[in-house]
Regions:
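Intrinsically disordered, low-complexity peptide-like regions
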Residues: 2, 16-17
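Intrinsically disordered, low-complexity segments enriched in polar/charged small residues
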Residues: 7-8, 126
Length: 404
């Protein structure tokens, strides 16, 4: 759940006569942002020292009048991401609603096991399938490390989930000095280049999609079917495998849990596959009936859970609970959401900076008491390659079905 706060500046006060240069409205807004983050977040300094955060906040506010729009965006993103790991809800998201919308180069990227590839584009469809090797004069590895301090995350999986949005945001690339001017040159492993102009982020979000959206594909793998259904229950292998695609942790789950249990009890069922790879959260009070059913011996002994980088927020809580309550085997990538994490963010609207900053307001502890693990580990790590994706293969599900 997110709430909205608008930072209202009290501009009626006058600076003292000994202060010839009072703070500008933008400087006051940024100072108030840092103060509001301290007051709102239950443990802002879990990974970053208080002195470091305050120094960075003051540095940004002091420099603000001299910053370009791009540098300001980068500075606010950096400040928001300072809290560190297990804090992926505290952030400036490029595809969010901002008072002054951001701009992106019209590509959708994905970080496969064999590198960052184009999985979709607007106006340059021939780029799909190409591996990115550089942006401007920087190698992609250099660009990733320059962008890293801006990307909110619970863990490395979550970082890789959101990273592509920042790698295509024009204000980010210009503000970091990776590109100059409006256009950006993306270089690819086949020796080709593409010079791209930015478009409104909303245009890309509504077509290619941002990180939470399923990857665009012409194929029909099981895990990308029935995407409009948040709780999709079906069978595979002629009824021998029960497959449940849990896409959002929202809505009642009692009826679905009972149906899953009934299918698992049928003679000849050898496996229950519970797929949360596309589940980026919702409400962690809704999945109790599912958890109860997964702990039933008739389900538990057949249970395999598929997780991925976009398994986030309440879905990360769910995975941690399944891990504690059952002997399920976990396959895929570690969930992008930590077992215990800061969440329930509010949205702070910066009117003068033209940005929306999200700040966590609660700590959700679903791991053991005091658990600071960044991820729920997988028993078998399986990460698709670009070749797998573009051929329509799902090596994660294939491995789950092949387990003894």
């Amino acid at each position: 759940m997110r709430r909205i706060v608008v930072l209202a500046l009290l501009l009626a006060g006058c600076a003292g006569s000994d202060d010839p240069q009072p703070p500008t409205p933008l400087q006051r807004e940024l100072s108030e942002l840092a103060e509001t983050m301290e007051l709102t977040h239950p443990e802002l300094f879990h990974d970053v020292p208080r002195a470091t955060f305050r120094a960075e906040g003051a540095k940004l506010a002091n420099a603000a009048p001299e910053l370009t729009r791009d540098e300001l965006v980068v500075g606010v993103m950096r400040l928001a991401a300072l809290p560190g790991a297990r804090d992926g809800h505290t952030a400036v998201y490029p595809f969010d609603q901002h008072a002054r919308g951001l701009h992106v180069y019209p590509l959708r990227l994905y970080d496969f096991a064999d590198g960052l590839h184009v999985v979709g584009s607007l106006g340059a469809e021939g780029l799909t399938g190409r591996r990115v090797t550089a942006i401007g004069d920087r190698t992609i590895a250099e660009v990733v490390e320059l962008v890293r301090p801006l990307v909110p995350h619970d863990n490395e999986s979550g970082f890789r989930w959101l990273l592509p949005e920042y790698l295509t945001t024009a204000e980010v690339l210009r503000g970091l000095g990776i590109v100059a001017g409006d256009t950006a040159t993306y270089s690819f492993a086949d020796g080709t280049d593409a010079v791209l102009e930015p478009v409104d982020a909303g245009e890309v979000a509504s077509t290619l999609g941002g990180a939470p959206a399923p990857l665009p594909t012409e194929h029909d793998p099981v895990w990308l079917r029935e995407l409009a259904t948040d709780q999709w229950l079906t069978t595979l292998e002629g009824g021998k495998v029960v497959y449940f695609g849990y896409r959002l942790t929202t809505g009642p789950t009692h009826d679905t849990a009972e149906r899953l249990l009934a299918l698992a009890r049928k003679p000849g069922v050898r496996r229950v596959v519970f797929d949360v790879r596309l589940n980026h959260g919702g409400d962690n009070t809704t999945y109790g009936p599912l958890l109860d059913v997964l702990a039933r011996p008739v389900v538990e002994r057949k249970l395999v859970v598929l997780t991925g980088r976009s398994t986030f927020s309440a879905a990360g809580n769910f995975v941690a609970e399944v891990d504690r309550a059952t002997s399920a085997r976990f396959l895929g990538e570690p969930a992008g959401g930590a077992p215990s994490q800061w969440g329930d963010s509010i949205a702070i609207m910066l009117e003068r900076a033209g940005l929306t900053v999200h700040v966590a307001t609660a700590y959700w502890e679903f791991g053991p008491p005091g658990d600071k693990r960044q991820e729920t580990p997988v028993d078998v790590r399986v990460e698709p390659t670009a070749a797998d994706f573009f051929a329509g293969r799902d090596p994660v599900l294939a491995r789950a079905l092949a387990l003894p």
